[in-house]
Amino acid sequence: MSETVEQEFAPGNHPDLPPPIRTTGIIGWSRKNLFSSPLNTILTLLTLLLLWKSLPPLFEWAVVNSISSADSREQCWNQMSSPGAGACWAFIKDRVELFTYGFYPHELRWRVNISFLLLALALVPVLYEKLPHRKYGLLYSATFPFIAGWLLVGGFGLESVDTDQFGGIMLTLIIGVTGISFSLPIGVALALGRQSNMPVLRILCVLFIEFIRGVPLITLLFVASTMLNYFLPPGTVYALLVRVLIMVTLFASAYMAEVIRGGLQAISKGQHEAGDSLGLTYWQAHRLIILPQAMKISIPGIVSNFIGLYKDTTLVLIIGMMDILGLGNASLADAKWAGLAMEVYIFVALYFFISCFSMSRYSLYLEKKLHTGH
């Protein structure tokens, strides 16, 4: 049998043996990441011990002893062996519409549902490069904010809805998606302006970036709430939501500009010279050579800014806007469900974790896809 195997391959062309099983798969990953040194081994064992002690009671509280059907906290506790022995998810079930739509009129919530669906469709051409006829999809994505604004606010044949009635997950998505969508292009423009050879433009960009970065977001939200109307033309009054969107976008743009500027500075001078040697103009060289490389380098920082901005949307509760966290806090004041803060904060934490973890995983996917180093 061995002679037959040896005759199948010419000398020197025998295929390589598979790598040792200890260096591949889950075993190899564990050896490399969890047990690579004595310190890592100790930390891994301590973490496993902590999980072994904490996960079973948590699972018992959140799943085994939980109550999903009740009309009040007392009814939940009456169904348990002892008060608080399990999670009362009936509270979340009772308030899920409030947490999703805020105070949006019940009979008009179909418009919010359509907006959620259109948002998902608008993300498809942005996230998937190989989508057929992607340029038309990107055109739709660019027009989505105006379509969603018309659906949510009304007008042009639809019943108008005051933005003060926006709240919950809907408000969180509006602020987060708007800030993320507009901060990236504005940040690119500010980063290019800061590196411009035109002194006036460069100074204006530097002043804007440094001023915004030196002021807490809470301060800007208070400015949006109380002072921004004084800087507008007489007789011009914008809704609080519009003013908040402006301030959040400007705040995120300043931080985005610094992230992208770091990517631009990482590009070697030879790349600029390559564009000059091809006879490209400044804008052509940046569009085709410089910016794509800078954006690839900046992906971790960009997504980190997106995640931070999305979590910062909870700060709007300070100026009286009821996002998902604000509505959760307000719901705890209801005597019928008082004392169930744990369930509320776990629900809010899970929502933000799923959203932010999804952005983080997509960032890793992009980094691996665009990795062209050797």
Language-model regions, residue ranges each:
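Transmembrane alpha-helices and adjacent helix-loop boundaries
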Residues: 2-374
